[in-house]
Swiss-Prot record:
UniProt cross-references to InterPro entries, sorted A to Z: ATP-grasp (IPR011761), ATP_grasp_subdomain_1 (IPR013815), D-Ala_lig_Van_CS (IPR000291), D_ala_D_ala (IPR005905), Dala_Dala_lig_C (IPR011095), Dala_Dala_lig_N (IPR011127), Mur-like_cat_sf (IPR036565), Mur_ligase_C (IPR004101)
Gene label: murC/ddl
Cofactor descriptive note: Binds 2 magnesium or manganese ions per subunit.
Catalytic activity: UDP-N-acetyl-alpha-D-muramate + L-alanine + ATP = UDP-N-acetyl-alpha-D-muramoyl-L-alanine + ADP + phosphate + H(+); 2 D-alanine + ATP = D-alanyl-D-alanine + ADP + phosphate + H(+)
Coiled coil: none
Phylogenetic lineage: Bacteria, Pseudomonadati, Chlamydiota, Chlamydiia, Chlamydiales
Name of this chain's protein: Bifunctional enzyme MurC/Ddl
Binding site for ATP: 111-117, 600-655
Amino acid sequence: MMKSLFYHFIGIGGIGMSALAHVLLDRGYSVSGSDLSEGKVVEKLKNKGAEFFLGNQEEHIPEGAVVVYSSSISKKNPEFLSAKSRGNRVVHRAELLAELAQDQISIFVTGSHGKTTVSSLITAILQEAKKNPSFAIGGLNQEGINGGSGSEYFVAEADESDGSIRCYTPEFSVITNIDDEHLSNFEGDRELLLASLKDFALKTQQICWYNGDCPRLRSCLQGHTFGLDSSCDLHILSYYQEGWRLYFTAKYQDVVYADIEVQLVGMHNVLNAAAAMGIALSLGIDEGAIRNAFRGFSGVQRRLQRKNSSETFLFLEDYAHHPSEISCTLRAVRTAVGQRRILAIYQPHRFSRLRECIDSFPSAFKDADEVLLTEVYSAGEEAEDISYQKLAEAISQESIVKCTHIPFHELQRHLEQSIRVHDVCVSLGAGNIVNLGEKLRDFEPQKLHLGIICGGKSCEHEISVLSAKNIAKHLSKSFYDVSYFLITREGLWESVSSLETAEDSGKSVFDPEIAQRLEKVDVVLPILHGPYGEDGAMQGFLETIGKPYTGPAIAFSAIAMNKVFTKRFMSDLGIPVVPYLPLTLAGWKQEQDKWLAHIVEAFSFPIFVKSSHLGSSIGVFEVHNVIELRDAINEAFMRDNDVFVEENRLGCKEIEVSVLGDGSGAFVVAGLHERRGSGGFIDYQEKYGLSGKSSAQIVFDTDLSKEIQEQILEAADKIYRLLLGKGSCRIDFFVDEEGNFWLSEMNPIPGMTETSPFLTSFIRKGWSYEQIVHQLVIDGLQRFNQRQRLISTSFVDQAFAIQ
């Protein structure tokens, strides 16, 4: 190409066209272009010297200019017709791309999904390796640039959608995958699409890397493969996602590349990173450059790009518009955010795509909690008659989520009324839904009104209040407003603005003042220990009045606080428990001597007598003879209707494990710790440092072997899963000198005072106090949402039954 040539782009603001315009401008060519609107993409080009025309007019075509068009430009476009009639050279953007890349080592990326991410990753690797590549990519980097001219290499996307990949003969290539996308351009025949990809691979001069996990590609392509399948040339051995980052280990040519970190999310991006890595290794790029590029990758705009400034909720924008892309994106977000409510705002892109994929779209939203469906963005297609209500119903049915049709012009207002603290909003689509995030950039949702309930009728009243005071110190004022409800030892309620001003007096929970203040609360934090607070009673009350609450759910509270039931259930499932013998009040009253004889025969003194429903150090008695045994059992039955005797584990380590989350989904097991007393059994006073006693020592760096620690953590994980744990829990074990361990008991609402190890366990894991509270609130809200969905469904069923 001659230096004096002038290039004019019809539709210069398009993502593919603007990339080539950047390359030409960097190489010193004169560039002009037209488009129907002027945005940030055009502004970047103008800053480089491009001339811009708003709208399409014949007179925009410069004399002697090469005129560039894309497949989206109509042959009836006035500028296209003018260029033809004047005799200007008119080229498709694919032809120009091929020309621009011909004097460099070209690396072209094609496939139904992932082209932009793979080409961006390859570009980042080459830049990290100081190779200064040229690039033309279908997405903007964080600087708003999608094209540029360099030296040795040229990285570009090759658009498979319109068949224009026939123009390319790259040195290296990547085929990411194949899906039923853009089939209308291939006479509705997926085999024609596959044939075009096969031809592209055959024309690759050196190496074609393709997805070895894709059967349709594997059946007809030759080249190097990447994927999870063990037969792949670049074999992904393992991967996991931690927050907003991926880690994977891969093997290529007998070399294992362990724990590669990528600043992306989702299994699909593991494959994308593997494809980029395969190209880089083929080019002889140093492993360090690959790792550094992946670790520092800043991403691509409109690929889970954060749009809002508020710290109390998250608004992400994503380009996903095909069912496969939507599913992968939402699954990645779910893994990153755990139990936070995900609101998916979906704008279908093109009537033809919706029609072609109508059977796949309804099931693509399974990882969302709620879907807002708006009108199709036509992208120039003729409008078709669509029943959005029926599509919303299909999404609700197949993805098991609430889906509502919201007209596009009402989306902003609806979201401003619906978004709450901790929500994650994800806009999905390739159309003008891009504007939604900008409109909500500075939006702030209302704070959540938390109601902390503490005190209670239990003998652990004092610890409950201390725990509540400690939690109150760490509540984020930007997230929450707080009210306090102190339950007296007599069971009366007092509503106060501060626990420091609380008096030991109160009213019935049915008193209008208490009821009205409870009504204003959005989420309740019950920080209660023992009966009437930790055993499901309070949880049942809160569900009855329709309030979300943190911590354990009804069933889990009731089960975990019943030590006999927990032991019996866990023992049946293979978890070792300390040998025990349950007693009933009726049986004990009628046949005390018989039970005493049975106990003495089964156990050796000292023996422990325990109440089944109280805390770990409440209603527990160490006895050394039959007289003490009888008295202790009588005393225990004064505190609880269910009592058991237990073989002693004196001399064993007391090991505790803290857990937060949903046992049927996402939960976190913190590292274990040891509670050491002054000797023998750790009673209530020593546990909390009361009555002049020194607190039991908490040891986090225990001298247990790594193997034993892992076994205990695995057991805690298993116990929480099997019991379908909800909210929070502390799981206690005994461990002897040989490394044998037994489940002791579970505490669904552990102490949360300044010295309580439950909170410290998560602090040592890298959490903040605020994060712990956030997690408790998020878990409670998510559980409430799930229950509300079931309630509303039952009402619908009843309505249909009545009709």
